[in-house]
Amino acid sequence: MSEFSYVHTRGWVEVVVGSMFSGKTEELIRRLRRAEFARLQIQVFKPIIDKRYNEMAVTSHDLTTIDSTPIHDAEEIWNLLKPNTKVVGIDEGQFFGQNLVQIAQDLADRGLRVIIAGLDTDWQGKPFEPMPTLMAVAESVTKQHAVCVVCGAPASRTQRTAGGDGQVLVGTHDAYEARCRQHFKPEVDAPTLDWKLKREMEIS
């Protein structure tokens, strides 16, 4: 089940995961907008390190936006939560600590609908906590897919094409590409190739 109809007396956790460029944030915004149409009070949070498009808004790669509050730690949600809030949205969940798991469950136990979007694996193809644990405890998990830049197949992995070997590197098209299993090469210095030319060479 990808999306629940809201029941006012119950809370739950929804998780939206996938590679970069798979539409995770767009899906998060869509669900939050639907909640607004239903006249439910929403609050949206994002990690303060995510300043790629707009520091004060959750923004998808196609520049769809929704106002948000940047925070350092998920624990800050408790001090910022408004009494009439019914739906909490959290983007880039992988950039928060493991305490996000318990906070999400505590919010749901209070009757709130919690929607969290984030990467389920990092640039090395390894589980990107806390998202895998959130997937395990959530009532609903949606796995989004991008399009592989090499062959056009559904892409479930994020290829880093530039910058350091740390797990966290905030970036967009300048540092990452979506890849399928076959074309995923988790080397930090993997170059961005002319894939159209490469495919033509393979065919000829």
Swiss-Prot record:
Substrates-to-products reaction catalysed: thymidine + ATP = dTMP + ADP + H(+)
A UniProt-annotated Pfam family: TK
Keyword vocabulary terms for this entry: ATP-binding, Cytoplasm, DNA synthesis, Kinase, Metal-binding, Nucleotide-binding, Transferase, Zinc
Active site: 92
Molecular function via GO: ATP binding; thymidine kinase activity; zinc ion binding
Subunit structure: Homotetramer.
Protein name: Thymidine kinase
